[in-house]
Amino acid sequence: MDDDNGLELSLGLSLGGSSGKAKARDAPLEPKAEPQVEESSSKGGLQTPDAPSGKFYQKSADNHEQNSKQRHSPVAPQFGNFWGQPGNSSGPVVDGSVEPVSHQPQLSSYQDGRMPINSGNNSEEQKPVSGNHKLPSEEMNFQKKHQTASDQPDAFSKSSDGGAKNAPISISTDDGSTGENEDVAESEAEGSNSWLVAQREDSAKGSVVNKGTDRKRSADAAADGFKGKRQPSFSGSESSSGKLTPGNLISMQASNVVALPYQVPGQVSGPPVLTNAPNFHPVCTVQLRPPTNGGLAVQTMGSASQVAFGYPAVQLPTLETGSSWAFGAPPQALSSFTAKDKADQTGTKQVDDGKKPREAGASSSAHAEDEKKADRGLSLMGSAIRPGIAPNVKFGGSGSYPDLPWVSTIGAGPNGRTISGVTYKFGRNEVKIVCACHGTHMSPEEFMRHASADAPAQDNSATLPAFPAGNQATSAEN
């Protein structure tokens, strides 16, 4: 491709691909080297043998200058060679070299060892061409770099484990500065790594939030269990986050749990209903948990109720509305044994309380029996002793007392008379009589003999004075 000035703008210009055209256009430049050699040979005859060596040094210097210019000239690698893969299309050949550009190393540092040493004519021909076309080739190289950079795939290829691998990127510029591109790649890699770290942190936060919500759900389920609700079953995949395994239904129990060494009946009688007890506290219900794995049954009760240990039955006593303790405190769960014990205690108390009236009754009955015996003794006496005071009785002492238990008898025989006396209880089954005429204490038999046989002796006795008949009337009036 040629522009208006006839300059070639192909990629192979910097590598010497168009050497034929350069020779045709720059042919007048070749005779310049020959006059210099002739002048140097004409200056001295001794220098003619050294002319070939001087020409050789001049050519080697020209080649060194050419190599330095080619080193600084921009090289536009193909896309296949950029990624380290050999290109399929044949590139331009450098100065008759058999190897194409694609098979030659792309780095400029390796080009010096493999560049062939060309003749002086080729070096002289490429000098003005490389000098004149340096600026357009740099512009094209800059455009090519932007195109290849835009056509390149992402430098970060995701590996199988989710990480990011950095592709080896080294873009050589005309001044040999590859560090900027590498810095850009490293900054992009750091940005992608930070993005991955942020994604992992977000996922970790999400898992923490999920665990927190799972714990909250389990706490809510526990709170629902205390209310008596049935717990739902969870899938097995959720067991790792603190949830329940499938098929396990757990009813939350109360705090006071007592293991009993016997089977407790599943049904418990409900609390008694009180119609006239508005201020009475509700009775604590008894919950029974069925035995698990063939173990012991567990009885759970509220904290307000007492637990009876070691007894088979759990009963609630019936309440009496008229009792004094019915409205004071809530009833307690009692076993049959404790209820029986209390019944025995109350029975013994009743027996103890009943002993006192029995004793009192026994004493009264004994007194009644004594009275009956006394009456029986009086009845045995027959009609000889009668209650009351005889009309012609003679009193000794200060007078008579009509409120006393008076008795009277009539003596038998020719000397018999009517005497009176006061009875009193001398012993448990014994009654004595005090005669009014002498004041002598005697038994009923003695009292009867005194009335019949002792009448003459009474007249002769000085201890018992005789009272006139007028005293009887006064005593009767009193």
From Swiss-Prot:
**One cellular component term from this protein's GO annotations in UniProt:** nucleus
Keyword Nucleus set for record: yes
Provide the species name.
Answer: Zea mays (Maize)
Q: Name one Pfam family in it.
A: TDBD
The annotated regions of Polar residues compositional bias extend over: 169-179
Q: Compositional bias (Basic and acidic residues) spans?
A: 23-35, 339-359
Name the residue ranges with Acidic residues bias: 180-189
Task: From the UniProt entry, list the residue stretches annotated as the region Disordered.
Answer: 1-247, 336-374, 454-478
Q: Which PANTHER family match?
A: AFP HOMOLOG 2
A single GO BP = negative regulation of DNA-templated transcription
What's the protein here called?
Answer: Ninja-family protein 7
What family, per the record?
Belongs to the Ninja family.
